[in-house]
Amino acid sequence: ADPIHLDRQLEYCDAQIRRTLNEADQDSCLMPRSMEANQTSWNMSNIYDWTSGFWPGILWYDYEATGNEEIKAQAICYTECLFPLVTSAHSADHDIGFQIFCSFGNAYRMTGNQEYKAAILKGAEKLAKLYNPKVGTILSWPGMVKRMGWSHNTIMDNMMNLEILFWAARN
């Protein structure tokens, strides 16, 4: 097997992130989500999409690897776009863990900003409210219970969202 050159891989990732930032409307809270085959521009999503925390999280990881303050500024901007997920009456589903911990979790880890810690704790609280003690799992999609006539639904993704609950319990 060929050796992995981590520095080169991180440089490539950083270049892709910068390219994406150049293409994105930075006065917007739309997040790059996906790109179809043969497409040259990103499909964007709003903050309520289940993937919305990934882009700020990627920016935080890039900042951690490069120390680039411009990347940090963008990471802060896109992270703070997600505050309405925890400060409004937004009805969360299990994806709140992805949305909040990838973004605010990394932001808090790298800055120590107490507002970010509060956002993580509020996100964890919203997720914990979806726990059903009868079933012993977290409800994935509250909106589907009534619509589909399900008494409860839990999908595998919930396992990935437990991290925010464990973190909140320690903090």
Regions found by a protein language model. Give the residues of each.
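Glycan-recognition and catalytic cores of secretory/periplasmic carbohydrate-active enzymes
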Residues: A1-N171
